[in-house]
Design a protein with these regions (language model features):
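Helix N-cap / loop-to-helix initiation motif
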Residues: 64-74, 171-175, 228
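Gly/Pro-rich active-site capping loops and adjacent beta-alpha segments
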Residues: 1-51, 116-266
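Accessory "access/gating" subregions that flank catalytic or transport cores
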Residues: 75-141
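Generic alpha-helical secondary structure signal
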Residues: 71, 94-98, 204, 250
């Protein structure tokens, strides 16, 4: 249902309707139906939750009709790596089988139902994300912290998530990353916050900025040690060379202003 005007999320609904299952031969027709209600708009996996409810309801009816245990049916028909989604893309590793198997093996699922009004259900769902474009820069500070500048408006904790991704890349704690969401003039082009893309796309930008910092830190350490950069490596938050040469991230950060100036990754 689109409400009083066209524009319901019918396209992602069609993309998601069979996406939890291996369906080798399928055709999906979607209709944007106007009704006498307020206009719809996108909110958290638009289109997917509605079609997943419909699909999983039908799957439960099939299981009941054929006397098949619900997790068994889902495991036997699960989408997995190499399966082509109904709208074309081929899956990498998606974890559908592993998730259902973990549910099936859980103490909760194995506990017998004893009450007259007790029941237990299982449902699966699918959502994708878009990539688009993101930019991020990260600057090493002399106190060992890192300033992360990015352009994705934070509506659900992305500052924390991106800080954790950069911190993991550099082998430091998330608390040592200081994230900031800045305006259009202060960072490279960054697409919309939406489409489940920020942690993925802006996260990749943050990780690449971290990788750039790693390379520059290794080059700076090689200069200090007067050795070939090829023998210096970055490992677990440390810069390690030959002959027992070693800096922690914080130790080398304290030396950057006296050995060539700030280090910024992008």
């Amino acid at each position: 249902e689109a409400g009083g005007y066209t524009g319901s999320p019918i396209a992602p609904g069609c993309m998601c309707v069979f996406s939890c299952y291996e369906v080798p031969h399928a055709r999906v027709d979607g209709f944007d139906v106007c009704v006498n209600k307020p206009r719809t708009n996108a909110y958290r996996a638009p289109g997917s939750t509605q079609v997943c409810f419909a699909t999983e309801t039908i799957v439960d009816e099939i299981c009941k009709e054929l006397d098949i245990e619900p997790t068994e049916f889902r495991l036997n028909n699960a989408a997995k790596e190499g399966v082509r989604r109904v709208d074309g893309p081929v899956y990498g590793k998606v974890g559908m089988e592993e998730t259902v198997q973990a549910i099936r093996d859980s103490d909760h699922y194995q506990t017998p139902l004893t009450g007259k009004f007790q029941g237990r259900g299982i449902a699966t769902g699918f959502w994708f994300n878009c990539g688009l474009k993101s930019a991020a820069t990260a600057t090493v500070n002399p106190d060992g912290t890192v300033s992360l500048v990015e352009g994705s408006t934070d509506i659900g904790g992305s500052r924390t998530g991106l800080a954790m991704q950069l911190a993991e890349t550099l082998g430091i704690t998330a608390e040592e990353v200081k994230p900031a969401v800045v305006d259009t003039d202060s960072v490279g082009y960054t697409d919309v916050t939406g489409g489940s893309r920020v942690t993925f796309a802006t996260g990749i930008a943050a990780i690449k900025a971290g990788n750039d910092i790693q390379q520059q830190m290794c080059a700076r350490a090689a200069m200090i040690w007067d050795c070939d950069e090829a023998v210096v490596r970055y490992e677990d938050g440390c810069i390690i060379g030959s002959e027992n040469n070693r800096f922690t991230f914080k130790e080398l950060a304290a030396k950057i202003n006296a050995t060539g100036g700030p280090i910024a990754g992008r």
